[in-house]
Amino acid sequence: MIIGNCLILKDFSSEPFWGAVEIENGTIKRVLQGEVKVDLDLSGKLVMPALFNTHTHAPMTLLRGVAEDLSFEEWLFSKVLPIEDRLTEKMAYYGTILAQMEMARHGIAGFVDMYFHEEWIAKAVRDFGMRALLTRGLVDSNGDDGGRLEENLKLYNEWNGFEGRIFVGFGPHSPYLCSEEYLKRVFDTAKSLNAPVTIHLYETSKEEYDLEDILNIGLKEVKTIAAHCVHLPERYFGVLKDIPFFVSHNPASNLKLGNGIAPVQRMIEHGMKVTLGTDGAASNNSLNLFFEMRLASLLQKAQNPRNLDVNTCLKMVTYDGAQAMGFKSGKIEEGWNADLVVIDLDLPEMFPVQNIKNHLVHAFSGEVFATMVAGKWIYFDGEYPTIDSEEVKRELARIEKELYSS
């Protein structure tokens, strides 16, 4: 299949050119320049690499808007956790379908998830067609985790590598909800399987632990995606740049819960690898990485207008996000995954077209025309080809009534 006769943005550092993309067996076979015979004419559009959301809790779409204007502690312990206690497997499945519907509308091809009922989240990813790195959220009390690590291992054995779209890692929630001994068990398990870890680190100013301890029990040796890192001590930046450590910067969620602004520019200047995430819809409340990208840039520019430039922002949401998750995506090049986004250039905010990359970061609403994963459309011109969206809406209506009737 050849798509194009439109502008092509190959990667974060390139400039758009007129051309087309040939796709075969889920990968990019050729990138063509000039006008060619195509199977799908995308005149008036831009094709670019898809985006990757490196931190979310997908079923929390069901909790969107339930807790507003609260501190982090009030939000989590008084509002969110009591509702989560009522979430069933079916709810997790449809909450994840809904999350993918929203993310696909915003050009996202894959996401990192930490939650429970992860087997049903995996089924939702299987059915919808996205990519995902899935982890079971892990906590313990004096070494007893209620069987959570075994659940995570079962998830790994059953789903890791599925269709080349689903990878499974391990999800210790945070150092304040996991004992040091338990964290070591988790990192040792991940290391033995060559699997990644995702964890919340230094999200709030109240977190008091020494990262040196976590480095020594496994963080140095296991690929890790660390969400937030708002209050990560700068003395560790130099160490973290030399290990397989990726920050997932979640600016909207961090601001909304009053947790502050991560020093992203300083991290990048030290050579650290930084990606972007949305967090869950209960704390954002959107799953729009284009919005997140703009917000991230503006927050850093408050100190210096040269901070977090356009190319850096685009790299964070495409190439860096894909690398963190373990996918050969984020560039339109021969042999790379056909994970693509199509954007309508007739939108008012996309004019003048000569400044297109700037618009993607600082003007675009995030409502894309189409999103492709592994050569298949998961969203195209308002439709979701892989699911029955009307059936999903009916199920979500029933779930809302069940979840909030009491």
Swiss-Prot record:
Cofactor: Zn(2+)
SUPFAM superfamilies: Composite domain of metallo-dependent hydrolases (SSF51338), Metallo-dependent hydrolases (SSF51556)
Highest taxon in the source lineage: Bacteria
Catalysis performed (reactions): S-adenosyl-L-homocysteine + H2O + H(+) = S-inosyl-L-homocysteine + NH4(+); S-methyl-5'-thioadenosine + H2O + H(+) = S-methyl-5'-thioinosine + NH4(+)
UniProt record similarity statement: Belongs to the metallo-dependent hydrolases superfamily. MTA/SAH deaminase family.
HAMAP family according to UniProt: MTA_SAH_deamin
Protein's name in the database: 5-methylthioadenosine/S-adenosylhomocysteine deaminase
Lineage: Bacteria, Thermotogati, Thermotogota, Thermotogae, Thermotogales
